[in-house]
Amino acid sequence: MKIVLISGLSGSGKSVALRQMEDSGYFCVDNLPLEMLPALVSYHIERADETELAVSVDVRSGIDIGQAREQIASLRRLGHRVEVLFVEAEESVLVRRFSETRRGHPLSNQDMTLLESLKKEREWLFPLKEIAYCIDTSKMNAQQLRHAVRQWLKVERTGLLVILESFGFKYGVPNNADFMFDMRSLPNPYYDPELRPYTGMDKPVWDYLDGQPLVQEMVDDIERFVTHWLPRLEDESRSYVTVAIGCTGGQHRSVYIVEKLARRLKGRYELLIRHRQAQNLSDR
């Protein structure tokens, strides 16, 4: 049976993610105490029900992270396919969302401010985030989050999933990257007026960057580094690794490098490509 555990920071979009799972055909349960998860799985097995399960777990249920990781390991030992989806957002974004909705944080009380509650929750859930596929919703609306969840569900995973993500430094760095590489020292197509309107997916930019020896040297170096270290992470039973590639605006160099790496790694690893700034190319 396939089981998806959805967790993350309050205000980051867990409910939206769970609704998308339901729309995708999953049997969904919100805020299930973890000690009840084996009983839920057994119930569906006894009914010969092949429905895929999506369960939201968070601080409201007094989640014990050590217990959560043990539950995941136990279910996997029984042959179930267990995935963890973790949604998060920047602190300032979460504060704004709580202010707009006028809802209280689950950990808020007279002795703890909203910021303190968010910090405690982030620290509490970090061990779960370490084994999860992470979606940062800071710059997403509900529709974009739903799209990101749908794209994640499309990837058939039997081993390590490598997420290749392009981004622009001027918009901030991804907070869920395992490896991050800076492309700002490479020749920039942006300064060519004819290339500026294009992205790193378009042939004119490809032809330009393909002809730059420094760019090809960078691709070779990143490929060598990544292929050296990914097997070690796989040995640690990691399910996901995010490789973030950044340039100034996230439109040309970083997109090109991600696509180039994807072509080289295809067939060796399961890949998910994300272009954070080039929205029309995202989550293919």
Curated annotation (Swiss-Prot):
Molecular function GO terms recorded: ATP binding; GTP binding; molecular adaptor activity
Pfam families: PapZ_C, RapZ-like_N
SUPFAM superfamilies membership: P-loop containing nucleoside triphosphate hydrolases (SSF52540)
Protein residues bound to ATP: G8, L9, S10, G11, S12, G13, K14, S15
Superkingdom, taxonomy of origin: Bacteria
Binding-site positions, GTP: D58, V59, R60, S61
Keyword Nucleotide-binding listed: yes
Region forming the signal peptide: none
Keywords carried by this UniProt record: ATP-binding, GTP-binding, Nucleotide-binding
Alphabetical list of InterPro entries matching this protein: P-loop_NTPase (IPR027417), RapZ-like (IPR005337), RapZ-like_N (IPR053930), RapZ_C (IPR053931)
Keyword Nucleotide-binding: yes
Family that this chain belongs to: Belongs to the RapZ-like family.
Function in brief: Displays ATPase and GTPase activities.
Protein name as it appears in the record: Nucleotide-binding protein NMB0738
